Regions:
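C-terminal catalytic histidine-bearing segment of alpha/beta-hydrolase fold enzymes
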Residues: 264-281
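Alpha/beta-hydrolase active-site loop
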Residues: 158-179
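N-terminal cap/lid segment of alpha/beta-hydrolase-fold proteins
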Residues: 56-109
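Short beta-strand/loop motif that positions the catalytic acidic residue
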Residues: 236-239, 243
């Protein structure tokens, strides 16, 4: 399984940031409990920065091998619910950068919150809507959004540079037009983080963000000059301790630099597993 195709971390990391970002940015309440016993953090090995930095216990049998009925292909049924499929559609959004194909689950008009997930290299819009792969985490995100008046979107895009930025900025403009008061959380896996930082620096789209999630991803010093940084948009990093693509020491250094440049900035860092494939909670 490639670094870009994360297996277990994404859903519960989203759940963690729903409270972190939406409460900080808009005063919204946390989402109701949904399969929390299956997706909650295991033991905390260490904690620093008043809890903003945590190292989470990792066990391969518990967190990977024991979770799937068919290894890396189908999670055990107890981790998923197919209720949200009733709210799921393959759609095309019309944007200033042209049509953008995406999977959408939830309330497309007047959503209470919006989550966009941008895949890494080799992924596509279907990855973030798969119910049974990735430990059931995407299914959990889908249900948290669809069953609580939110909207979860996983788009296709042309690249991780100018064209992709234009498409995602256009998509954000389109979905915000249908739910102008909804906090919008942009989440990015692996190389998709290049677009997270580009959108943060986009003069219009960057100011519309309510939260950023970087999963096993990269860093960008340009963030410090971005509209998102100036707005103090909350940032959440989830990273593996031995990530072979994006070294954890560099991502940790970037986390520290954010705290140094803007004391009290709402930023959190979680370490679990060895790479993006093992991120779970």
């Amino acid at each position: 399984m490639s670094h870009e195709m994360s297996k277990h971390g994404i859903g519960s990391l989203f759940g963690a940031l729903f409270l972190f970002s939406t409460v900080t940015a808009s005063g919204a309440a946390s989402l109701p409990s949904y399969k929390d016993d299956y997706f909650a953090y295991p033991a905390i090995i260490s904690s620093a920065d008043n809890g903003d930095y945590k190292v989470i216990d990792y066990n391969e049998m518990r967190d990977i091998n024991g979770r799937d009925a068919v290894p890396e292909k189908r999670v055990k049924d107890t981790y998923v619910s197919l209720k949200a499929r009733a709210y799921q559609k393959d759609v095309t959004f019309q944007t200033a950068a042209g049509p953008v194909k995406a999977m959408a689950a939830g309330k497309r008009e007047g959503a209470s919150f919006i989550v966009l997930y941008l895949h890494g290299r080799g992924g596509n819009r279907l990855q973030g809507m798969n119910d049974f792969t990735f430990g059931g985490n995407f299914n959990r995100v889908k249900n948290l959004a669809a069953l609580n008046g939110g909207l979860y979107i996983t788009p296709d895009f042309k690249d991780f540079a100018d064209k992709g930025e234009a498409q995602i900025a256009g998509l954000i403009e389109a979905v915000k037009a249908s739910a102008p008061n909804a906090p919008l959380i942009l989440s990015c896996g692996s190389q998709g983080g290049a677009l997270c930082w580009r959108i943060a620096s986009n003069q219009k789209a960057g100011s519309q963000l309510a939260g950023l999630i970087l999963l096993g991803s990269l860093w960008d010093d340009g963030f410090f000059d971005s509209p998102a940084f100036k707005k103090r948009v909350p940032v959440f990093f989830g990273h593996g301790s031995r990530d072979p693509v994006f070294a954890i020491d560099k991502q940790e250094a970037f986390y520290r630099e954010i705290r140094k440049r803007a004391p009290g900035y709402p930023v959190q860092f979680r370490v679990q597993g060895e790479d993006l494939n093992q991120l779970r909670a």
